[in-house]
Curated annotation (Swiss-Prot):
This protein's record includes keyword Repeat: yes
InterPro entries: Ankyrin_repeat_domain, Ankyrin_rpt, Ankyrin_rpt-contain_sf, CC144C-like_CC_dom
Phosphoserine PTM positions: 829, 897
Protein name: Ankyrin repeat domain-containing protein 36C
Domain of life: Eukaryota
SMART domains reported for this sequence: ANK
A GO molecular-function annotation: ion channel inhibitor activity
Stretches with biased composition (Basic residues): 942-955
Family: Belongs to the ANKRD36 family.
Keywords: ANK repeat, Coiled coil, Phosphoprotein, Repeat
Species per Swiss-Prot/TrEMBL record: Homo sapiens
Length: 1778
């Protein structure tokens, strides 16, 4: 078992009482399982197959009602599941919890098992005890793939029981947002209701989940559904005091009412946005602006946004997603943002405007709210039918201004004020009323809600700021201004949606908002819900608007004090600073046929996080298109916020796009996506953009200005991009500008971005990814970056323009950052051109305190047919990290092509950031390329790949690229300026490469310059690189990998590098130029270095010439304190027919650690003299040069670069090439003979060494084979050990089964004893009853005797009376006496019956005695059994002890095996050490070879000192020979040592053979012991059978006892009846006694009276003789009556006889019981005999155990012998090692 069992498994009751999701695993124990279940549980496939072959029931259940398939699915065994399913087992059987194998597999996340079951027809809709299906558990586990599989195999998404939730409700109750979204996509019933009538929305509201509420509202859930109690979701929200959710639902209901009631209503609002749209046919404008996505966190915020959009479209135009101004938060202390975009659109037919503006996504929390505004808000929010009621113009203006656009999280009912008194706090009210939805993912805590409630309860004037009162006329202009408390930033988004910026004085303007739509939402992968709240406006017109905020000093003490309640409302807010941000975009679009403009501007995605922020955004955009045009994603200005203490962003962008036919502009602007985190941020963005296209053009993602935030103390960013594009037919402009992707993270940042883009295309041109100005932010103390790209492109047919600029991707982290980015890019193409990835300004952030970066790229491209222009510039990819960084990047690129040209990856100026304290980088580069047919320009410039880590870096990069191509030309990978980082104190790098290429047919220029690959790591670095390259080819030329200037970093204190290589190449047909220059490969590592490298290379090829790897400038860095190297090589070569120039220049590869003695491989004598003069002027540094650095990168073929400097043949060839290059002066006979001799000696020595190495390798292989044999033997031993373990496990299992059987027997004995006690108690109760009856009958007997005596006396008296005259009276008395006699006879009968009962009682007592005797016998038997059990338990304990000893011995054997393994590892280590020594010898050879090469190089460079160098070489060769001899002796010694080791190994092998023989003997002994164990096991099985027989006998005893109990119950019933009859008789007897006593008294009286009258009778005898006769007749009658009484007595006697017969029957039954007792006694005697036999068997087992002990002792002795042998072998090995 892999899983460990817990200490206590949950019982079935615990599992059923839980929620069903706890305790998913089965509590599996060995005694629960049967044969097939054990095979599955122990993962034994072979055993399972064997069990299935024996026709075992495959669906059999274990003791917990689980099938084998349940266990296989629960333990995750797909092979077992496949086997069981193939044998046709039932798939839908249930366990105790009614769970099928499929449910169990899904619950335990066993996807493979579940898929197998589904593929074979398992039912996914079966419910368990809790009413859940497999889909419920998949939702609970958030397993989307499993859910899709279940749904694909027919699972019902709504299946559940009556009391259980469906899967959608389960996801809501578990707060799983991703699952809710997924189920809604899978078309789950959103309006489903549970058993209480509650919908999913009600559940989400009760849980307080804003994200889920938004999702449900976006999918149009029924808000008006009531539960059983008649409550709505809104009621639950109000009861929970969750204002956010309540206002969401209320806003949704309000929009529903507006949709139903009002289609259009002219409203004059205070923010004064204007939108004009006229459409011709089926036009749609949707999602124009989603200004704010996330919240703004600052102390004081003033934002003005005045966008204007103008557009005209004729047919099928659509404008969607115009602006998403703010996506993320702006976190700062005090922020004043002004956003003034203008958007105008005009269409003729059937235009539709949807989702124009969703101003607010997240909530804003501020201190004060304007009373009049709040009054309007309260009135509108608490009045559902506010639209239908009449309202005044002023009230309606305020309500439409604040309610229809903004969402208010806080309300207060305050007494109304006049408009004049209202003006000053209007800004505060609007700030507080802004509702930002980015916080939806956060649950509303009690603490936050308590704070909010406290803040609401406070009076209005507690946190009011000291602001001068203004007149009522300024109210209209002031409504667009937002403020917050200390620590939050707010910007008003949908202020002046179209066009004209409001003046600072504030003028009134009319606004006609359209009908706002319902929720539209997009879900991201990272955060499941990127919450947006979208709205739309049909016609919005407004003028310009601006506002001013008071500084921090004007605030009151309550505001400035952080301990006040106003400051405590936001916990995450930093201390307030100063921020001034202005955003003034303008946009105009005109389209004729089927135009669509979507996602025009997403101004701000994430807000700046700073103390004070004043942002002004003024973009302008104009677009005109004819047919099927679409403008999308023009500008994504800022994605992540400005994170600084004080931020003043000013963003002024203007776009003008004119489309004629089929142009689509998507995602025009996503202004700001990240916030700036700093103290003070001032950003200005003013990008203009113009584009014109004819047919099916699409502009995607024109500008994404800022993605990440500006994280700095003070940030002033001005972004002024301009984009103009004109296309005729089917053009597409996409992703024009992504201005800033990541924010600027610094203390003070001032960024100005003014890119201009103009593109004109004719047919199907595409310009994509023109500029991504800044990808990562500038992380520094002070950063000033200016980016001014300009792009112009014109194409005729099928052009596409996409991804023009991405100004900033990551944030700039510094205290003071000033960034200005004006870029201009122009591209013109005729047919099917595409410009992709023109500029990526900054990718990573600049981490400095002061960074001033200026980027001025310019790109111009013109192409005729099917050109593609992509990846033109990537200005900065990674950030600059320094205290002061000034980077200026104005690249210019011009490309013209006729047919199928493509320009890709033109410039990537900076990839990684510059990380230093002071960095000033300027990069001006120029590149021009012209090609005729099928040319491609790819990867023209990569400015910097890794960052520059210096204290002071001033880098200037000014690349220029111009390319012109006629037919199918492509120039790839022209320039990669900087790849790796520059790490130094102060770095000033200037890179000015120029590239010009012209080709006619199928030319390709790729990888032109790669200026800097690795960073410069030094204290102060100033690098200037000026590279110019011109190449012209006619047919099928390819230029690739032209320049890789710097690959590795320069690591020194101060570096100033100036590199000015020039390369010109011209070829006619099928020429290829590749890898022209790699300037620096490894870094320069020194304290202060100023390298200047100026190389010019000109190569002219005519036919089928291939130039590969022409120049790898510098492959190694300089490691010294101070170096000033200059390399000025030039290369001129002309090859006419099918020649190849290989390995032209390899300047430096590895690190240089010497004085500037440079290698000049292709230089003239004049150049050498210049170098010598320069070297004499340079200071001397004690360092050396490795000549290997110049010869490692020489290339042997025309296509591949070989940097191998190991083989001597290559070195010889290289030396010969060097001699040829240095003309005839080096070709002396003497020198050549010496060189040849040295080569021959080296070859011979290497051959000898190779032979020795081969011999050593053979020996090593033999040793490895021996080691493998030893390992096999060890593995065999381990298998034997594993078998022993398996056997011990089986013995343990049997012991466990025996213990379990003993426990069961003990339980049964306890039950028997309890039954005996119950029987005894019943017998005692019956005895007591009999005793009580006997006591009652004793006093009755004398009464009966007295009654008989009285009867006799009465008879005598009656005879006497008969004799007298009074016979009549006596006759009457006689009758009475006869009745009494009959009664007495009945009493006699009862007495007889009592006597009989006494006899029966005696018999019962006898039976009881016998029963007690039997119980005593049973007790004796039990005692004997207990004794036998104790004996067996002792034996079992002894066996367990023996097992433990065996285990310990096995562990010892394991340890010995491990020791052997460790020894083998030590041998391996030694072998590895020998190999390392061999490798060291090789390395020494290589070192000698390198020294030899150094001498050869010195001979080439210094012709005058050849003789001295030859002497030095001879000395070095003698030293090498001596070293070789020493090495040979060492090899000889090692060979002898290896021989000794081989002998030792042979000895060890012999010992191992002896051990194997001993192991075989042990195995034989073990087999014999195993046979005895099998016999013992058979006897134990017999013992188990006897126990089973005893169990059967005990069951029979129980049955007999049950029968006896039934009979006793019958007897007791009879006795109860008899007792009842006796009691009745006794009562009658008492009554008769009383009557007889009374009669006796009467008789005595009558006798006395008769005596008195005797005399009278005697006297009257004669008179009464007649009377006597009459009396005689009466006596006859009395006799007749006596006969009748006799008959009655006979009947009573018969009844007594019947009773006697019943008693006889009972006696017979008692006899039967006695016989049964006798049988039970016989069975007990048989059991006693069996126990005696078992005792004999136990004695035999003891004897066998003794034998086993002896065998185990023998094995122990053998193991000890083995251990001794192992110890001896270890000692031998130690001796061998010593």
């Amino acid at each position: 078992m892999d899983d460990k069992e817990p200490k206590r498994w949950p019982t079935l009751r615990d599992r059923l009482c839980s929620d069903g999701f706890l305790f998913p695993q089965y509590p599996i124990k060995p005694y629960h399982l049967k044969g097939i279940h054990r095979a599955v549980f122990y993962r034994d496939l072979e055993e399972l197959k064997f069990v299935l072959l024996t026709r075992y029931d495959i669906n059999k259940r274990d003791r917990k009602e689980r099938t084998a398939l349940h266990l296989a699915c629960a333990t995750g065994q797909p092979e077992m599941v496949h086997l069981l399913v193939s044998r046709r087992c039932e798939l839908n059987l249930c366990d105790r919890e009614d769970r099928t194998p499929l449910i169990k597999a899904v619950q335990l996340r066993q996807e493979a098992c579940a898929t197998l079951l589904l593929q074979n027809g398992a039912d996914p809709n079966i419910t368990d005890v809790f009413g859940r299906t497999a889909l419920h558990y998949a939702v609970y586990n958030e397993d989307t793939s499993m859910i899709e599989k279940l749904l694909s195999y027919g699972a019902n998404i709504e299946e559940c029981s009556e009391d259980e939730y469906p899967p959608l409700f389960l996801a809501v109750s578990q707060r799983k947002v991703k699952m809710v979204e997924f189920l809604l996509k899978k078309k789950a019933n959103i309006n489903a209701v549970d058993y209480l009538g509650r919908s999913a929305l009600i559940h989400a509201v009760t849980l307080g989940e804003k994200d889920i509420v938004i999702l449900l509202l976006q999918h149009n859930i029924d808000v008006f559904s009531r539960d059983v109690y008649g409550k709505l979701a809104e009621d639950y929200a109000s009861e929970a005091k969750n204002r956010v959710i309540f206002e969401l639902i209320y806003e949704y209901e309000r929009k529903k009412h507006e949709e139903l009631s009002i289609n259009s209503n002219p409203v004059s609002s205070q923010k004064q946005p204007a939108l004009k749209a006229t459409s011709g046919k089926e036009d749609s404008i949707s999602n124009i602006a989603t200004e704010i996505k996330d919240g703004q966190k600052s102390g004081t915020v003033s934002s003005q946004k005045q966008p204007a959009l103008k557009g005209t479209s004729d047919k099928n135009d659509s404008v969607s997603n115009t602006a998403t101004e703010i996506k993320d938060e702006q976190k700062s202390g005090t922020v004043s943002s002004q956003k003034q975009p203008a958007l105008k659109d005009t269409s003729d037919k059937n235009d539709s405007v949807s989702n124009t503006a969703t101003e607010i996504k997240d909530e804003q929390k501020s201190g004060t709210v304007l009373p009049a505004v709040e009054q309007c808000l309260n009135r509108s929010l608490y009045r559902p039918d506010a639209v239908a009621q009449p309202v005044t113009e002023d009230e309606f203006a305020l309500e439409s201004e604040i309610i229809s656009k903004l969402y208010i999280p806080k309300r207060k009912i305050i007494s109304p004020r006049s408009i004049e008194d209202v003006l000053p706090p209007v800004e505060e009210a609007v700030d507080r009323c802004l509702y930002l939805l980015d916080r939806f993912a956060q649950a509303v805590t009690k603490d936050k809600f308590a704070l909010e409630s406290e803040n609401i309860s406070e009076p209005y004037f507690t946190n009011r700021r000291t602001i001068s009162q203004q007149s009522a006329e300024k109210l209209d202009a002031a409504c667009g201004i937002d403020k917050t408390e200390n620590g939050t930033l707010f910007e008003d988004q949908n202020v002046d949606k179209e066009g004209k910026a409001l003046p600072a004085t504030g003028q009134k303007a009319n606004v006609s908002p359209e009908q706002p739509p319902l929720f539209t939402h997009t879900v991201k992968d990272s955060d499941h819900i990127s919450t947006r709240f979208l709205g739309s406006m049909d016609s919005l017109t407004s003028s310009e608007e601006s506002s001013e905020r008071p500084p921090l000093s004007t605030l009151t003490l309550k505001e400035a004090d952080p301990s006040s309640k106003a400051a405590m409302r936001r916990k995450d807010s930093p201390p307030p600073g100063k921020v001034s941000s202005q955003k003034q975009p303008a946009e105009k679009a005109t389209s004729d046929d089927k135009d669509s403009v979507s996602n025009i501007a997403t101004e701000i995605k994430e807000g700046p996080i700073s103390g004070t922020v004043s942002s002004q955004k003024q973009p302008a955009e104009k677009a005109t298109s004819d047919e099927k045009d679409s403008v999308s994603n023009i500008a994504t200005e800022i994605k992540e916020g400005q994170q600084s203490g004080t931020v003043s962003p000013q963003k002024q962008s203007a776009w003008k796009v004119i489309f004629k036919k089929k142009v689509s502009l998507l995602n025009i602007a996503t202004r700001i996506t990240g916030g700036g985190k700093s103290g003070t941020v001032s950003s200005q963005k003013q990008p203009p953009s113009k584009a014109t296209s004819d047919k099916t053009d699409s502009a995607l993602n024109i500008a994404t200005e800022i993605k990440d935030g500006l994280q700095c103390g003070t940030v002033s960013s001005q972004k002024q991009p301009a984009l103009k594009a004109t296309t005729d037919e089917e053009d597409s402009v996409s992703n024009i500008a992504t201005e800033i992707k990541d924010g600027e993270k610094s203390g003070t940042v001032s960024s100005q971005k003014q890119p201009a883009l103009k593109a004109t295309t004719d047919e199907e041109d595409s310009v994509s990814i023109i500029a991504t100005e800044i990808k990562d932010g500038e992380k520094s103390g002070t950063v000033s970056s200016r980016k001014k790209p300009a792009l112009k492109a014109t194409s005729d047919e099928k052009d596409s323009f996409s991804n023009i600029t991405r100004e900033k991707k990551d944030g700039e982290i510094s205290r003071t950052v000033t960034s200005e980015k004006p870029a201009g890019l122009k591209a013109t193409s005729d047919e099917e051109d595409s410009v992709l990835n023109i500029a990526r300004g900054k990718e990573d952030g600049e981490k400095t305190r002061r960074v001033s970066s200026r980027k001025k790229p310019a790109l111009k491209a013109t192409s005729d047919e099917k050109d593609s222009f992509s990846n033109i510039t990537r200005e900065k990819k990674d950030g600059e990290t320094s205290r002061t960084v000034s980077s200026q990047k104005p690249p210019a690129l011009k490309a013209t092509s006729d047919e199928e040209d493509s320009v890709l990856n033109i410039a990537r100026e900076k990839k990684d950031g510059e990380k230093s304290r002071t960095v000033s980088s300027e990069k001006p580069s120029g590149l021009k390329a012209t090609s005729d047919e099928k040319d491609s320009v790819l990867n023209i410039a990569r400015g910097k790949k890794h960052g520059e880590k210096t204290r002071r870096v001033s880098s200037h990069k000014q690349p220029a690229l111009k390319a012109t191509s006629d037919k199918e030309n492509s120039v790839p990978n022209m320039a990669t300026e900087t790849k790796d980082e520059q790490i130094s104190g102060t770095v000033s790098s200037q890179k000015q490469p120029a590239l010009k290429a012209t080709s006619d047919k199928k030319d390709s220029v790729s990888n032109i310059p790669t200026e800097i690959k690795d960073g410069q790591q030094s204290g102060t670095v100033s690098s200037q690189k000026q590279l110019a390259w011109k190449a012209t080819s006619v047919k099928k030329d390819s230029v690739s990998n032209i320049a890789t200037e710097i690959k590795d970093g320069q690591i020194r204190g101060t570096v100033s590098s100036q590199r000015q290589p020039a390369l010109k190449a011209t070829g006619d047909e099928k020429d290829s130029v590749s890898n022209i220059a790699r300037e620096i490969k490894d870094g320069e590592k020194s304290g202060t270095v100023s390298p200047q490298k100026q190389s010019a290379q000109k190569v002219i090829f005519k036919k089928k010439v291939s130039l590969l790897n022409i120049a790898t400038r510098i492959t190694g860095g300089w490691k010294s304190g101070t170096e000033y190297p200059e390399n000025l090589p030039t290369l001129k070569a002309t090859i006419e027919n099918k020649n190849s120039v290989l390995n032209t220049a390899t300047k430096m590869k590895d690190v240089q650690t010497s004085t500037p003695e440079q290698d000049l491989e292709m230089a003239s004598e004049g150049e050498q003299k210049r170098l010598e003069e320069y070297e004499n002027n340079q200071p001397q540094v004690k360092n050396q040069i490795h000549s290997r650095d110049d010869l490692d990168d020489i290339i042997q073929s025309s296509q591949t670069v070989s940097e191998d400097g190991d083989s001597l043949c290559c070195n010889c060839k290289n030396v010969i090439l060097l001699i040829d290059q240095h003309e005839m002066k080096c070709k002396d006979c003497v020198h050549l003979l010496k060189i040849k001799k040295t080569f021959c000696l080296c070859k011979r020595l290497t051959e000898l060494k190779d032979n020795h190495c081969e011999q050593l390798r053979v020996k090593i292989r033999k040793l490895k084979n021996k080691a493998s044999v030893l390992q096999k033997r060890l593995s065999e031993k381990e298998e034997i050990k594993s078998q022993l373990k398996h056997e011990t496990l089986e013995l343990e299992k049997e012991l466990c089964s025996l213990r379990f059987a003993i426990q069961q027997e003990k339980k049964k004995r306890r039950n028997v004893e309890e039954l005996h006690q119950k029987v005894r108690e019943k017998l005692r109760i019956t005895e007591e009853q009999y005793r009580i009856e006997a006591d009652v009958t004793k006093p009755i007997k004398p009464a009966l005797k007295s009654a008989e005596v009285e009867l006799k006396t009465g008879g005598n008296n009656s005879n006497q009376v008969s004799e007298t005259d009074e016979k009549e009276d006596l006759l009457h008395e006689n009758r009475l006496m006869q009745d009494e006699i009959a009664r007495l006879r009945l009493e006699k009968d009862t007495i007889k019956n009592q006597n009989l009962e006494k006899k029966y009682l005696k018999d019962f007592e006898i039976v009881k005695r016998k029963h007690e005797d039997l119980q005593k016998a049973l007790k004796r038997n039990e005692e004997t059994l207990a004794e036998t059990i104790a004996c067996y338990s002792g034996q079992l304990a002894a066996l367990t002890d023996e097992n433990t000893t065996l285990r310990s011995k096995l562990e010892k054997q394991r340890e010995s095996g491990q020791r052997l393994e460790t020894e083998m590892q030590s041998y391996r280590c030694r072998l590895n050490a020998a190999l390392c020594d061999h490798d060291q010898s090789h390395s020494s050879k290589r070192d000698q070879e390198l020294a030899f090469q150094g001498t050869v190089d010195k001979c080439c460079h210094l012709q005058e000192n050849l003789n001295s160098h030859v002497l030095i070489l001879s000395l070095q060769l003698s030293k090498a020979e001596s070293k070789f001899r020493v090495l040979e002796t060492e090899l000889h010694y090692t060979g002898e040592a290896l021989k000794e080791k081989a002998l030792v190994f042979e000895h060890v092998q012999s010992e191992l053979k002896q051990k194997q023989s001993q192991m075989k003997d042990i195995e034989k002994m073990y087999k014999s012991g195993y046979n005895t164990m099998e016999k013992c096991i058979e006897k134990q099985e017999r013992f188990c059978q006897l126990k089973k027989q005893n169990m059967l006998l005990q069951q029979q005893l129980d049955d007999a006892r049950n029968k006896a109990d039934n009979q006793e119950k019958a007897i007791l019933n009879i006795q109860a009846r008899c007792d009842a009859r006796v009691e009745n008789l006794q009562a009658e007897c008492r009554k008769h006694r009383l009557l007889l006593e009374e009669d006796n008294k009467m008789l005595v009286n009558e006798l006395n009276h008769s005596k008195e009258k005797k005399c009278q009778y005697e006297k009257e005898k004669a008179e009464r003789e007649v009377a006597v006769r009459q009396l005689q007749q009466k006596q006859d009658d009395v006799l007749n009556k006596r006969s009748a009484t006799k008959a009655l007595l006979d009947a009573s006697s018969r009844h007594c006889i019947y009773l006697e017969n019943g008693m006889q029957d009972s006696r017979k039954k008692l006899d039967q019981m006695r016989s049964q007792f006798q049988e039970i006694q016989d069975q007990l005697t048989a059991t006693i005999r069996c126990t005696k036999e078992m005792e004999g068997d136990a004695q035999k087992l003891e004897v066998e155990n003794v034998m086993m002990r002896k065998i185990i002792k023998k094995q122990d002795e053998q193991i000890e012998r083995f251990e001794k042998i192992l110890q001896h072998s270890s000692l031998m090995l130690q001796v061998f090692e010593s």
